């Protein structure tokens, strides 16, 4: 908890020293404590005069990148540890372009973080007070719907015959299910089987050693349904 607060204070100090918009989008995935860390980051940002735009539920990382640009933010934070084992969680920072920050920017943010005392150097505001002050705002459904539409608009071909496609999908107990189902429905793919044991978000990832689709063990249950 203290590490997340310290990192966020450093990020806030960095952003406040630039000409970038004083607004940061935050998302988290299904990893343990993701919601808690999201709220703590929002509290710190609000206390530093930065508007925290928070997804109200877990969302995949690309949705965070989209929100940064869609909402005109100066940066973004995703509470995630990608494909690492369940014991980990992480803190990824994205630039105003929605991309992961460059090494040059990372060095500047790290320098700001290192100056922060995690006990006495962090500004905090009560979460509800931040909401009432308009410094903590919820990202609405239109943002995510427009994200799905933007992905759909990149499709290749006219979709002829796609209704015959039979698909097995697994979110690996992560966060992709909602967006993937919406996108497949728009494409006209109706024969979709979701791996039942891996459908529900679960930060313990009980069905595989770690949620990396590049390893066979993670995809084994899906392969068995094919």
Residue spans for each PLM region:
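Residue-level detector of functional hotspots within protein domains
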Residues: 9, 77-79, 95
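Short, highly selective alpha-helical patches that border small-molecule cofactor pockets
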Residues: 4, 8, 34, 38, ...
């Amino acid at each position: 908890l203290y590490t997340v607060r310290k990192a966020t204070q450093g990020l806030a100090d960095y952003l406040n020293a630039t000409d970038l918009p004083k607004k940061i989008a935050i998302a988290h995935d299904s990893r343990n404590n993701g919601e808690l860390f999201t709220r703590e980051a929002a509290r710190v940002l609000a206390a530093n005069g930065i508007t925290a735009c928070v997804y109200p539920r877990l969302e995949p990382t690309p949705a965070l990148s989209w929100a940064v640009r869609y909402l005109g933010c100066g940066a973004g934070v995703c509470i995630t540890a990608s494909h690492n084992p369940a014991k980990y969680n992480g803190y990824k920072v994205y630039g105003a372009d929605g991309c992961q920050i460059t090494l040059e920017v990372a060095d500047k943010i790290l320098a700001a973080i290192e100056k922060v005392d995690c006990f006495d150097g962090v500004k905090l505001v009560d979460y509800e007070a931040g909401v009432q002050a308009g410094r903590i705002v919820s990202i609405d459904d239109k943002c995510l719907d427009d994200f799905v539409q933007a992905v759909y608009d990149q499709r290749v071909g006219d979709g002829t015959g796609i209704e015959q496609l039979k698909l097995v999908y697994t979110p690996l107990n992560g966060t992709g299910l909602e967006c993937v189902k919406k996108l497949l429905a728009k494409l006209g793919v109706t024969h979709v089987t979701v791996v039942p044991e891996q459908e529900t978000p679960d930060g313990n990832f009980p069905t595989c050693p770690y949620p990396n689709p590049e390893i066979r063990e993670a995809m084994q249950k899906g392969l068995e349904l094919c």
